[in-house]
Every structure is written in C-alpha cells, then in structure tokens.
Curated annotation (Swiss-Prot):
Fe cation binds at H218, E233. Reaction center is composed of four bacteriochlorophylls, two bacteriopheophytins, two ubiquinones, one iron, and two highly hydrophobic polypeptide chains (designated L and M). The chain crosses the membrane at residues 52-78, 110-139, 142-167, 197-225. It is found in: Cellular chromatophore membrane. Belongs to the reaction center PufL/M/PsbA/D family. The gene is pufM. It comes from Pararhodospirillum photometricum. This is Reaction center protein M chain. Pfam families: Photo_RC. GO terms for molecular function: bacteriochlorophyll binding; electron transporter, transferring electrons within the cyclic electron transport pathway of photosynthesis activity; metal ion binding. The reaction center is a membrane-bound complex that mediates the initial photochemical event in the electron transfer process of photosynthesis.
C-alpha cells in the first residue's frame, strides 16, 4: 500500500531517549529519566510551520501582551467572575477614550488600556508583516503574501488610527469586543449611508471571498494530487499527462 507523502507531510520521530553517560548508582540524575511530551514537540515542530525567528517571536510576544490586556479588562468588567466572563464574553468590550480626551493619553479606566492595547497589537501586526516579507526575500519567493497582508493592515490602520487622527479624537476608533465592534460597524454604516448599497463595498467583498475560495480550491486540488507529483506544479504546468495537468483539467471541466 502506497504511503501519502509530499513536501508538506510532517515527520515526527520518537526514538528511545538517550540517557547520556552512565552515572554512579544513587545519583539523583539516574532517577530523572527523560520523557517525551507530545505538546512540547508540536510547539517546537519545524515541519508544522516555518521557524518564527526573531521577528516572529517579537510579534507573538507583542500580540500576547495585547490579548492579555483585553482579557484582563474583560474580567475586571465582570468583577473577576469567571462564570460571568464566559456568559457575557460576546458582550464585553474594551472601549476607546471618549472624544473629550482628543489625542492625549487617557486615564487607564477611561480608555488608556485601549490605547496601550492598540499600541501592542499594531506593533505586533507590523512586525509580523516584516517577518513575512523577510522570509519571502530570504527564500527567493515573491512578496505577494506580504503585500496582500499590507492591504489588510491598511484597513486596520485606517479605522483605528488614520480616521480618528483626521477627526481629532480616539473616540472614533473601533472598540475591542465581539458585539462591540459589530455595533460600531452598524453605527458607521448608518452614519455614512448603508454599506450594503455601496458598490465599492460590494466589489471588495466579492473579490475578497471570491479570491479566498479560488485559492482554497487551487491549494486543495494540488495537495490532492501531490502524491502523484502534482506539487511540482511549476515544472509540470506545460507538460501533457502530468498530475498538475489533470488537476487543471478537473476544474476546467467543472467550470464548463
């Protein structure tokens, strides 16, 4: 029976532990035998994803700070009650400062925590963009992913920084929270006209979801034929009878 193998197949090895140099009987290290922990192996498994490197690690730490600050504020808003935290989680929010604080650093309980969270989250996203860009250049790949991510970052910065800057206060920014940011979006839509009738909004959503589905279809198809060599798509794309050509024919026939 053939094994399913491709360049993305992760390999996990679990050999017998090496105990090192023989120690005198009675030594404490003799009793401390090494063990294998599956979860720790997944965390450090280089075959499951690329190594994070310095930029990736810095980005993860900054994101963790932002995540913890949001979580702590959510907990504080329900008097540190874990049951209420879980029950009310969709309604909890970390709000930006009120308009009267303009652009100054507001007191912690009046929007200061939101400003600090926004700083950590923004720096995390910018450092991660730098990580994606650098990895692509180091591997000799195109920087398409970095610039696609940059377009999403532009939307994030527009709503959370550029627009509030032009309007003169942090109160115009998006709050952190599930229903809170949806309520903000609904209010924004009512303020500037219904977004659902905006043709540019329609086109952006259509291209966003359409491109996501097309990329998923392509990636899934190539993975499905990778055991036949279809992952070598660049080399096979112009040849007849190859796995990549059969994959292309499948969708060509499907689309009519």
């Amino acid at each position: 029976m053939a094994d399913y193998q491709n360049i993305l197949t992760p390999c996990r090895f679990a050999p017998k532990p090496h105990h090192g140099v023989e120690l005198p009987r009675g030594n404490w290290a003799e009793k401390a035998r090494p063990i294998f922990v599956w979860l720790l192996g997944k965390i450090g498994d280089a075959s499951s994803d690329h190594p994070p490197g310095v930029a990736g690690t810095v980005s993860a730490v900054l994101f963790a700070f932002a995540f913890l600050i949001i979580g702590a504020n959510f907990l504080a808003s329900v008097d540190w009650n874990p049951i209420e935290f879980i029950r009310l989680l969709p309604w909890l929010a970390l709000e930006p400062p009120r308009p009267n604080w303009a652009w100054v650093l507001a007191p912690m309980n009046e929007g200061g925590w939101w400003q600090i969270t926004g700083f950590f989250l923004t720096m995390s996203l910018l450092v991660w963009w730098w990580h994606v860009y650098n990895r692509a250049r180091a591997l000799g790949l195109g920087t398409h992913m970095a610039w696609a991510f940059a377009s999403a970052l532009f939307l994030y910065l527009t709503l959370g920084f550029i627009r509030p800057l032009l309007l003169g206060n942090w109160g115009e920014a998006v709050p952190f929270g599930l229903f809170a940011h949806l309520d903000w979006t609904a209010a924004f839509s009512l303020r500037y006209g219904n977004l659902y009738y905006n043709p540019f909004h329609m086109l952006s959503i259509a291209f966003l979801y359409g491109s996501a589905v097309l990329f998923a279809m392509h990636g899934a198809t190539i993975l499905a034929v990778s055991h036949l060599g279809g992952d070598r798509e660049v080399e096979q794309i112009t040849d007849r009878g190859t796995a990549a050509e059969r994959a292309a024919l499948f969708w060509r026939w499907t689309m009519g």
